[in-house]
């Protein structure tokens, strides 16, 4: 009995499988039964309509009885019904499309993918927005390597006094270069993300070229096999 609380307190990294999402706890037998009582419809069975006239009439009668039942609900039951519908029914996809974003497990997502820019994440503008990303990456890489050499040169020099570093607002002599390297790396990542469309196009071209080369090889094998069969037939005819 004492091992149960210990197992429950284990972090996610020590478990074999990740825990299920918390909203599954809302699907209890009592909640489902109460939902079906208040709404007059089953939660998991889809009603098939429009197949036959008899079924259509039966469905219309059932909808009318459901509407009458909903009208007879008290205000407290109406609020309970709305709460259960929000917990148990499928999410409204049209609301997601209208809002343009949706939340999943604590993370906000957008219906249209947005590639971040240096300005949107607060980086110093090292890249001219008018310049293509593939043209701005080589200068960034050159600046990165140059700053790295300056950092190595600074770290191999004679150390300065702590008072001199404190007056400059640095914890170490390499702080300015480390910060510059960080900004350069972030700008390079932003520029690389902006090349996704070009990368996808290049990948598609490579796949098509590979498929074309494979088809050529198969065609060549078929031709060689046909020549082999034809030579065999001619040899048989000459007997």
From Swiss-Prot:
Compartment(s) where it occurs, according to its Swiss-Prot or TrEMBL record: Nucleus
GO CC annotations, alphabetized: core mediator complex; mediator complex
Subunit structure: Component of the Mediator complex.
Pfam families reported in the protein's UniProt record: Med7
GO MF, one example: transcription coregulator activity
Principal cellular location given in the protein's record: nucleus
Bias kind Basic and acidic residues: ranges: 46-66
Region (Disordered) residue spans: 1-21, 43-66
Alphabetical keyword list: Activator, Nucleus, Transcription, Transcription regulation
Task performed by this protein: Component of the Mediator complex, a coactivator involved in the regulated transcription of nearly all RNA polymerase II-dependent genes. Mediator functions as a bridge to convey information from gene-specific regulatory proteins to the basal RNA polymerase II transcription machinery. Mediator is recruited to promoters by direct interactions with regulatory proteins and serves as a scaffold for the assembly of a functional preinitiation complex with RNA polymerase II and the general transcription factors.
InterPro entries found in the cross-reference section: Med7/Med21-like, Mediatior_Med7, Mediatior_Med7_sf
Assigned protein family: Belongs to the Mediator complex subunit 7 family.
Superkingdom of source: Eukaryota
The protein's name: Mediator of RNA polymerase II transcription subunit 7
Gene name, Swiss-Prot/TrEMBL: MED7
Any one Gene Ontology BP term: regulation of transcription by RNA polymerase II
